[in-house]
């Protein structure tokens, strides 16, 4: 599985991991777990709040781990990793693939950390593992300050057409969303038709819909849902769709936008300075 990228936050976690090893030349799962606690941004703030008081205990455990093992070379770290870390990283990629995403993030790795047996699963209580499971599985709502939103970009990829949905698009959009995403989204979007100003944008490629975004579907001043076919997600289409909707909302006088049940949080952080509420 090579067709994926790593989010900036997870990359920082991996950098913290390598920079915190002291004289040990191999990475263990507990090193990654401690790095996630120390990263302390957005969703990992909750992890920091819950576990930072135990960081010295974790460091002591890490100091007593073997210093001479046969490590595995890998694409994530310069430093070799032990077998458990290799298994955790492979598991996190499997979790990512099941969500149809192309970016490996800290949530996928955290889920794998509490699933694959290691010193991390040994030191965590059942209650602590349950807390992490809830943290990973709870959707977050984000807020965007539209007063500071000026990133609308008209320089779109000329290979794709982004336009407002028309009444004639109803059934094509419904079928596309139901087939590639889910029927709940499809039903919600279809309920907006007919209208003189449909709050939905479509991405057209070779006369076919390959993506969409919407606003006001989940409530006034709310953004979402949004979806782009997996094979087109590295063309900045998602960002363009997001910008279109947020710009519409800003122009009509909205001061904020709410992104409900946000998926890739870092995507929204980078594109529109969204933050968890």
Residue ranges and their predicted role:
Residues 228, 234-247:
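Conserved acetyl-CoA-binding loop-helix of GNAT-fold acetyltransferases
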Residues 181-229:
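A conserved beta-strand-loop-helix scaffold within acyl/acetyltransferase catalytic domains
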Residues 262-277:
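Conserved active-site alpha-helix within GNAT-family acetyltransferase domains
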Residues 223, 257-261:
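Conserved hydrophobic beta-strand within the GNAT/NAT acetyltransferase core sheet
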Residues 1-166, 172-180, 196-198, 205-206:
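Histone-fold recognition with a strong bias for associated Lys/Arg-rich disordered tails
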């Amino acid at each position: 599985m090579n067709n994926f990228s790593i989010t900036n936050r997870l990359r920082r976690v991996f950098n913290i991991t390598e920079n915190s090893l002291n004289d040990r030349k191999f990475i263990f799962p507990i090193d990654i777990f401690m790095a996630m606690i120390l990263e302390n941004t957005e969703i990992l703030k909750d992890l920091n709040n819950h576990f930072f008081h135990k960081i010295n205990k974790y460091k002591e455990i890490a100091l007593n781990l073997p210093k001479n093992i046969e490590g595995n070379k890998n694409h994530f770290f310069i430093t070799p990793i032990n077998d458990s870390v290799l298994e955790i990283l492979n598991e996190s990629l499997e979790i990512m693939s099941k969500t149809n995403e192309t970016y490996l993030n800290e949530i996928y790795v955290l889920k794998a950390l509490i699933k694959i047996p290691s010193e991390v699963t040994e030191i965590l209580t059942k209650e602590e593992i349950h807390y992490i499971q809830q943290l990973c599985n709870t959707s977050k709502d984000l807020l965007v300050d539209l007063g500071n939103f000026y990133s609308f970009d008209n320089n779109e990829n000329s290979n794709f057409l982004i336009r407002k949905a028309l009444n004639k698009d109803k059934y094509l959009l419904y079928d596309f969303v139901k087939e590639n995403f889910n029927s709940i989204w499809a039903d919600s979007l279809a309920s907006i038709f007919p209208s003189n100003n449909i709050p939905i944008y479509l991405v057209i490629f070779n006369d076919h819909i390959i993506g969409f975004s919407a606003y006001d579907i989940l409530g006034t001043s709310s953004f979402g849902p949004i979806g782009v076919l997996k094979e087109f997600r590295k063309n900045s289409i998602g960002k363009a769709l997001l910008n279109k909707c947020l710009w519409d909302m800003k122009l009509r006088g909205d001061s904020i936008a709410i992104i409900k049940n946000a998926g890739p949080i870092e995507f929204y952080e980078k594109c529109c300075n969204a933050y968890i509420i």
